[in-house]
From Swiss-Prot:
Organism: Baumannia cicadellinicola subsp. Homalodisca coagulata
Protein name, UniProt field: Large ribosomal subunit protein bL19
Family of the protein in this entry: Belongs to the bacterial ribosomal protein bL19 family.
Function, as annotated: This protein is located at the 30S-50S ribosomal subunit interface and may play a role in the structure and function of the aminoacyl-tRNA binding site.
Keywords: Ribonucleoprotein, Ribosomal protein
Biological classification of the source: Bacteria, Pseudomonadati, Pseudomonadota, Gammaproteobacteria, Candidatus Palibaumannia
C-alpha cells in the first residue's frame, strides 16, 4: 500500500531547478481572473524551504512599495509555470526569518560563487 502511494506521488512531482535559501528567484504562476487565465511573476528571495516530498513548499519574500510581501508556494503545484534562479546567495542558515526585521542595505546577502 505504501509503495503504491509513493509511486503515485512520484509521478506528480515536477523537475525543478536546484535552489536554496538566500537565492533570488522568479516564480511564474498561473492566475485566474474571471474567465481569463494569465501568468503572473513573483520575484524575490527564498527565506525558507520545507521538504516534504510531494508536499514540499518554499517561501519567497520581496519588498513591494516599501512593504514586505511573503508568499508560500507548493513546489509541485500545477499553478507554477516555471521557477528561475536569478542570483545565488551565500547564507549559513536554513531559515532566513531574521530578514523580516531588516530593511535596505542591512537585508543584503552575499553572492555564492559557484565553481
Amino acid at each position: 500500500m505504501f509503495n503504491l502511494i509513493q509511486h503515485i506521488e512520484h509521478e506528480q512531482m515536477k523537475n525543478l531547478p536546484a535552489f536554496r535559501p538566500g537565492d533570488s528567484v522568479e516564480v511564474k504562476v498561473w492566475v485566474v481572473e474571471g474567465s481569463k487565465k494569465r501568468l503572473q511573476s513573483f520575484e524575490g528571495m527564498i527565506i525558507a524551504i520545507r521538504n516534504r516530498g510531494l508536499h514540499s513548499a518554499f517561501t519567497v519574500r520581496k519588498i513591494s512599495n516599501g512593504e514586505g510581501v511573503e508568499r508560500v508556494f507548493q513546489m509541485h503545484s500545477p499553478i507554477i509555470e516555471s521557477i528561475t534562479v536569478k542570483r545565488c546567495g551565500f547564507v549559513r542558515k536554513a531559515k532566513l526569518y531574521y530578514l523580516r526585521k531588516r530593511t535596505g542595505k542591512a537585508a543584503r546577502i552575499k553572492e555564492r560563487i559557484s565553481s
